[in-house]
Amino acid sequence: MRLEKCWFCSSTIYPGHGIQFVRNDAKIFRFCRSKCHKNFKMKRNPRKVKWTKAFRAAHGKDMTKDTTFEFEKKRNRPERYDRNVTENTLMAIKKIAKIRTAREAKHIENRLKPNKQKKLNDDMKELDQNIHMVQAPGAQKIKVDVSEKKSVQNEAMEE
């Protein structure tokens, strides 16, 4: 089964899905959905559209340079079937997937770390400025006795 990549968003296109556009110079553009095709016709740059993989790679949102990506290269050379090689390949795929998920999690954690510290500093600054609004959890509530002057005024209003 041949899986293609969308020209605009780089997502996988399965057989029987998507649309294909062939330019006069025989350049083939494949699109996964009409959203990508419309954006292409509007001459939008995929690196500037926030939901595309090109944007995420260009702005450091996703992991782009990693040794685990080299295993996914397309190879057009047919190889003779060997059960042992196939078994080893399938085991290697599982190990690589596990390594990649761990590295992606670490990448996300490192990417969010500076903002986490900045948010903590901003929260501490706001707390220092508005400390008078915070009540101590161990403080007892003060009960205020209402004087009878108000009740006399209420009776006068009722009449």
Curated annotation (Swiss-Prot):
PROSITE patterns: RIBOSOMAL_L24E. GO terms for cellular component: cytosolic large ribosomal subunit; nucleolus. It is found in: Nucleus, Nucleolus. GO terms for molecular function: structural constituent of ribosome. Belongs to the eukaryotic ribosomal protein eL24 family. Associated with nucleolar and cytoplasmic pre-60S particles. At the end of biogenesis it dissociates from cytoplasmic pre-60S particles and is likely to be exchanged for its ribosomal homolog, RPL24. Interacts with REIL1 and REIL2. This is Probable ribosome biogenesis protein RLP24. It comes from Arabidopsis thaliana. The gene is RPL24C.
